[in-house]
Amino acid sequence: MLLRDLVLRRGCCWSSLLLHCALHPLWGFVQVTHGEPQKSCSKVTDSCRHVCQCRPPPPLPPPPPPPPPPRLLSAPAPNSTSCPTEESWWSGLVIIIAVCCASLVFLTVLVIICYKAIKRKPLRKDENGTSVAEYPMSASQSNKGVDVNNAVV
């Protein structure tokens, strides 16, 4: 609020504001370091004795008691001396085998796709500059002669 009033009344007072912000912490530091450390109450004047009283700080209050343990909503299980049942290791083995089989199938399909892509014949350039794949049907169709209806007279 005070800052807004200063800016509105004086227009642009950034230099004085920056000077104030820079010197304010320095002035506080000077005020704090101006006093001398006090060793005991025997060398204290009456004016200082009134301010500091030379008493030790009061003891800290005792810590609060720990919170009670949480209550269980369900009935507690009866204490049994029998050992807990061990989990079967077959389920983990089945999962590992299933993941390995799925990975093997995926890699096999990937190898087949790559093999077919590499084995495919490369494209050749046609007379008009377009790329045409060399498949048996396209090669036989491109070797046909000029049609009689398209002959130029």
Swiss-Prot record:
InterPro entries attached to this UniProt entry: PRIMA1 (IPR029659)
Composition bias type Pro residues, residue spans: 59-71
Superkingdom: Eukaryota
GO (cellular component) term, any one: anchoring junction
Cytoplasmic-side positions: 114-153
Transmembrane stretches, start-end: 93-113
Residues covered by the PRAD domain: 56-70
Membrane-related topology note: Single-pass type I membrane protein
Range of residues in the leader sequence: 1-35
Regions of this protein lying in the Extracellular compartment: 36-92
One Pfam family recorded for the sequence: PRIMA1
Regulation: induction: By RAF1.
Keywords carried by this UniProt record: Cell junction, Cell membrane, Disulfide bond, Glycoprotein, Membrane, Neurotransmitter degradation, Signal, Synapse, Transmembrane, Transmembrane helix
Region Disordered, annotated ranges: 59-79
Glycosylation, residue list: N79
Subcellular location(s) of the protein: Cell membrane; Cell junction; Synapse
Free-text comment on this protein's domains from its UniProt entry: The proline-rich attachment domain (PRAD) binds the AChE catalytic subunits.
Function: Required to anchor acetylcholinesterase (ACHE) to the basal lamina of the neuromuscular junction and to the membrane of neuronal synapses in brain. Also able to organize ACHE into tetramers.
Quaternary assembly: Interacts with ACHE, probably through disulfide bonds.
Protein name according to UniProt: Proline-rich membrane anchor 1
Species: Homo sapiens
Lineage: Eukaryota, Metazoa, Chordata, Craniata, Vertebrata
